[in-house]
UniProtKB/Swiss-Prot annotation:
Keywords: Ribonucleoprotein, Ribosomal protein, RNA-binding, rRNA-binding. The lineage of its organism: Bacteria, Bacillati, Cyanobacteriota, Cyanophyceae, Oscillatoriophycideae. This is Small ribosomal subunit protein uS8. GO terms for biological process: translation. It comes from Picosynechococcus sp. (strain ATCC 27264 / PCC 7002 / PR-6) (Agmenellum quadruplicatum). SUPFAM superfamilies: Ribosomal protein S8. One of its GO terms (molecular function) is rRNA binding. Belongs to the universal ribosomal protein uS8 family. It comes from the Bacteria. One of the primary rRNA binding proteins, it binds directly to 16S rRNA central domain where it helps coordinate assembly of the platform of the 30S subunit. Part of the 30S ribosomal subunit. Contacts proteins S5 and S12. Signal peptide: none annotated.
Amino acid sequence: MAANDTISDMLTRIRNACMVQHDNTKVPMTRMTRNIAEVLKDEGFIENYTEAGEGIEKHLVISLKYKGRNRQPIIQKLQRVSKPGLRVYSNHKDLPRVLGGIGIAIISTSKGVMTDRQARKEGIGGEILCYVW
């Protein structure tokens, strides 16, 4: 099934896999989904990701992270902000703080995909893709 919004598709697959405590999930690969997975890995929300498949069948295998004996998912919530029908942009001064800095906002900027903290530090704004906490 082809998804028009690959970012929402990726976030939904991760959210569903966390709810049923799967160790990993498969996501169709684009440059944007790879960059988002890299940010999630750097921020400690996922264990790792690997690229698999070839050509049109290329996908990411994302290893999810859990804590404690009853395997509580590290990712409590994934929320899509900017959608194909309603894009949300912000300059570096107005970038939101997610849960007072506990969570992150993933921003697509002219210098690539990064967290809200990195964008504020570099003084650049961009499209707010999603919130993660």
